[in-house]
Amino acid sequence: GSVIKCGESCLLGKCYTPGCTCSRPICKKN
C-alpha cells in the first residue's frame, strides 16, 4: 500500500497527483 501525498500547489486549479483535488492553495485527498 502506497500512501498518496497531495502537497502540491494548485493555483491553476489542477492537481496532477491521482486521487487529489484542489483545495487552494494546495492539493488534498478527495
UniProtKB/Swiss-Prot annotation:
Comment, domains = The presence of a 'disulfide through disulfide knot' structurally defines this protein as a knottin.
What is the stated purpose of this protein?
Probably participates in a plant defense mechanism. Active against Gram-negative bacterium E.coli ATCC 700926 (MIC=0.6 uM) under low-salt conditions. Not active against Gram-positive bacterium S.aureus ATCC 12600 up to a concentration of 100 uM under low-salt conditions. Exhibits immunomodulatory activity but no cytotoxicity in vitro.
**Cited PROSITE patterns:** CYCLOTIDE
**Free-text tissue specificity from the UniProt record:** Expressed in root nodules but not in seed.
Q: Cross-link Cyclopeptide (Gly-Asn): which residues?
A: G1-N30
UniProt cross-references to SUPFAM superfamilies, sorted A to Z = Cyclotides
Q: What is this protein called?
A: Cliotide T19
- Cysteines paired by S-S bonds: C6-C20, C10-C22, C15-C27
Write out the entry's keywords from A to Z: Antibiotic, Antimicrobial, Disulfide bond, Knottin, Plant defense
Which family does this protein fall into? Belongs to the cyclotide family. Moebius subfamily.
Looking up InterPro entries in the UniProt record yields: Cyclotide (IPR005535), Cyclotide_sf (IPR036146)
Modifications made to the protein after synthesis: Contains 3 disulfide bonds. This is a cyclic peptide.
Q: Which domain of life is it from?
A: Eukaryota
Q: Name one GO biological process term.
A: defense response to bacterium
